[in-house]
Regions:
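Short, solvent-exposed aromatic-acidic interface loops
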Residues: 2, 24-28, 106
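Acidic, metal-coordinating catalytic segment for phosphate/diphosphate chemistry
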Residues: 1-15
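Unchanged
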Residues: 5-8, 39-130, 152-156
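Glycine/small-residue-rich phosphate/adenosyl-binding loop
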Residues: 19-22
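Short, surface-exposed secondary-structure junctions/capping segments
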Residues: 12-17, 42, 128-135
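Charged phosphate-binding loop/patch that engages nucleotide di/tri-phosphates or the phosphate backbone
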Residues: 134-153
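A conserved beta-turn-beta hairpin within the catalytic core of GNAT-like acetyltransferases
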Residues: 27-34, 83
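Beta-hairpin (beta-strand-turn-beta-strand) motif
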Residues: 12-14, 24-27, 36-41
Length: 156
């Protein structure tokens, strides 16, 4: 199945150490599911421009690009046996940001909330693309928190 590429982003508010999570109806699994901000790229659109556009449309969050850190996790096929959809996955570490009006597609309704890391790590998320970003951040946190400690812990 032919499919446009997409962007998936784990969004981290550095000032509060909270993460942005979404809940929306997913037709493919016929259920409401938790996940991360994501969306299809427009033809010819730059990856970062697409990520920031989707983030603003779904959540109203508009980061300051000059103070935002980006960890590009990688490019992964969503299901290479079924589709050519390539997911560009990243973690955005936000400094200051502003809020704008959200703009949903006609068939889209997304709820979003900022939650602490422990809550995110405990949330049942079934999207593999979202889990790739979350696992990447878990490793980053593990390395950062335990660089001078004897015992690693993902929950500190």
């Amino acid at each position: 199945m032919r499919h446009a590429p997409c962007v998936v982003m784990l969004v981290h508010d550095m000032s509060t150490d909270r993460y942005l999570i979404e809940r929306e109806y997913r037709a493919g699994s016929d259920m409401f599911a938790y996940g991360l901000p994501a969306g299809l790229m427009d033809e010819g659109e730059d990856i970062m421009d697409a990520a920031l556009r989707e983030l603003a449309e779904e959540t109203g969050v508009v980061p300051d690009r000059d103070t935002m850190g980006v960890d590009f996790v990688g490019d992964f096929y969503s299901s290479e046996g079924m589709t050519d959809e390539l997911a560009h996955i990243m973690v955005l570490h936000l400094g200051p940001f502003r809020r704008e009006q959200r703009h949903f597609d006609a068939d889209e309704h997304v709820e979003s909330a900022w939650i602490p890391w422990n809550d995110l790590a405990a949330t049942r998320i079934t999207s593999s693309n979202s889990m790739i970003a979350i696992q990447h951040e878990a490793l980053r946190r593990l390395i950062a928190r335990n660089s001078d400690k004897d015992k690693p812990s993902l929950f500190s």
